[in-house]
Amino acid sequence: MLARPPTASILLRSPFSCLPARRLSLSSAPPSAFFSCRLSTAATRPPPTAQRALLYVPGSNPKQLKKCLGGGLAQSQPDALILDLEDSVRAEKKGEARRNVLDALQATPDCPSQKFVRINSKQLGLDDLEVLLTTPHLEGLVLPKVHSAADVQLVDRFIEEHGLRETKDKLRIVASIESPLALLNLREIATSSTRISSLLFAAEDFCASSGLIRTPSRREMLFARSSVVTAAKAFGLKAVDLVCVQYKGDEALGVLEDEAREGRELGFDGKQAIHPAQVNVIQAAFTPSPAAIERALAILSQYEAARSSGAGAYGLENADGSSSMIDAPMLLQAEGTLAQARAAGVDV
């Protein structure tokens, strides 16, 4: 078990701190000190970028690939695209889809979205990689049916042996959590490779393999979703929430908005999308609101005043005239809010 270094706060222990084993007071440490480090397993990972909406695009549809990769979604362009070679592609179309995806990646190097490909599992996935690793325009992979560290390490070794020298160290891996076994092995999956950047919760597969009955409340998946978030945050990874299978009409978008808000409250960084109509709703839900940004800025501003007086905690006046005590954990939350806003392109 990894030991957690002591916190830099005089008030509470912080699970985010990687500072040396000494005590500091809020009056001697800048706010950024509390967010400056991650666990050593994340030391060589690429810098974080927003992954609010991750939109699946069938690899068997060249027209959709061209539109999505070419920036043709206009105001609905997601943070990330997942070009799919797995569930959305019939068995007899796998080879054709593989070629479609490679051609699309080669033709659109300036795509405004991050470019991931969901490969198949087992040998078929290695066949996918043989083709995909020939292009420098692939940014990451979504690995389906990850049950243990071995599933990630197989792909990791293949990338190391066959990837292009100039790009293989930049490739990110998103591990799809789809089974009870994967849930039990979250720790080893999260630390299986320095290429791991995110854990993704695949709700339909998880319910099918667990015998869970899907309900509108989603309460049957609360433990699994929370476990994925906890593991991701423990090791400096992003957590991606489930797909909302409804996308047509106002009622469907209302369900999506509720799901996305709930996912954000649970700690997820983003959510999978299966239709461009879902993108804006998702990205709005995972972007800090103007009020949240304003409050975060006020907390950091008040921090400077408290630091000069040597106070470890201080009060902040709320919009309704009441006051809230602000201490180290809330300072961390404020830093996190501003980091999320900047990653989403908000000028803070």
Feature roles, as predicted:
Residues 2-348:
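Expand to "…catalyze enediolate/carbanion chemistry for C-C bond making/breaking, isomerization
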